[in-house]
Design a protein with these regions (language model features):
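Nucleotide-sugar-dependent glycosyltransferase donor-binding/catalytic pocket residues
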Residues: 16, 217-221, 235-239
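Conserved donor-binding/catalytic core segment of Leloir-type glycosyltransferases
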Residues: 9, 205-222, 228-231
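Short hydrophobic "strand-cap" motifs at the C-terminus of beta-strands
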Residues: 10-12, 124, 149, 180-183, ...
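Charged active-site motifs of nucleotide-sugar-dependent glycosyltransferases
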Residues: 4-7, 120, 205-212, 242-243
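A short helix/loop element that forms part of the nucleotide-sugar donor recognition site in Leloir-type
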Residues: 163-164, 189-205
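Carbohydrate-associated surface elements
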Residues: 43, 152, 183
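Extended catalytic core of nucleotide-activated donor transferases of GT-like folds
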Residues: 9, 54-145, 151-154
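N-terminal subdomain of nucleotide-sugar transferases
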Residues: 1-57, 91
Length: 243
């Protein structure tokens, strides 16, 4: 059997509960039969900063992949150039995969010429706001491959990486931009029976034809006020007797 490729993952610590962390864990656990993983696990004021944690045995038990290899280096924030050089020298990854807003990675793009001499840079990205963010184009060109989480992102990245307006701009090939939507582990996320005492507590003993559930952080950028306003307008349309 040929030796598995090792991927260096730069993202939120996969043991955390953020969206980035949750999908990082799903991505890693779903590909352990294909790749070995080393993660720089980001968090704010990480309590385990600087301690390399070997999760391989636990991952082997959870996934059934006998040769699963997963290590995490917890860190404050997403790292820096000096840290990356040290890891590349010690771990010798075959590729770097980073994940989250591109503006967190300007230090990475500043050294892309140095990195890409030895391994490619991969980016799992989402950007859903139009018009196309031309200011992101150089970030995208710093990557050898981009996986777009949404169709909107795929369109944006495809258009920007195909531009040739400037002499220094080199368009990406078709294979360098792919649509890779989020998936879920159906063994963990599945319909289930809700205990009647829990349902009664949540709904105050009332019965409804259907119930909306919104799970998110209560912060401004998640726009909870928009959700409340949309729900109010919905209730106004169906009438008080049904709301």
């Amino acid at each position: 059997m040929s030796k598995k490729k090792k991927i260096l993952l730069l993202s939120d610590d996969m043991r955390m509960s953020s969206g980035i962390a949750t999908m990082s864990k799903a991505l890693v656990m779903g590909t352990l039969n294909e790749y070995d993983w080393f993660q720089v696990g980001a968090a704010i004021k990480h309590p385990d900063k600087g301690k390399v944690l070997d999760l391989s045995v636990d991952m082997q038990k959870r996934t059934g992949v006998e040769d699963a290899s997963v290590k995490i280096l917890p860190w404050n924030g997403y790292g820096n150039a000096d840290l990356l050089r040290q890891i590349m020298n010690s771990e010798k990854p075959d590729a770097i995969l980073h994940f989250t807003d591109p503006h967190y990675w300007t230090w990475l793009y500043d050294m892309e010429h140095e990195i890409r001499e030895s391994c490619p840079i991969l980016y799992y990205t989402i950007w859903d706001d139009l018009p196309d963010p031309l200011y992101n184009r150089n970030y995208y060109e710093s990557c050898d491959w981009l996986g777009a989480i949404s169709r909107q992102t795929y369109g944006i990245v495809s258009r920007l990486t195909s531009l040739t307006d400037k002499p220094t701009w080199k368009p990406h090939s078709d294979w360098q931009v792919a649509y890779v939507p989020h998936g879920i582990n159906e063994n963990e996320f599945k319909p289930t029976e809700v205990p009647s005492d829990f349902r009664n507590k949540i709904l105050a003993g009332k019965e409804y034809d259907f119930v909306f559930f919104w799970s998110n952080r209560n912060i401004r950028r998640k726009q909870p006020s928009d959700v409340i306003m949309a729900f109010k307008e919905f209730c106004d349309k169906i009438g008080k007797d049904k709301a």
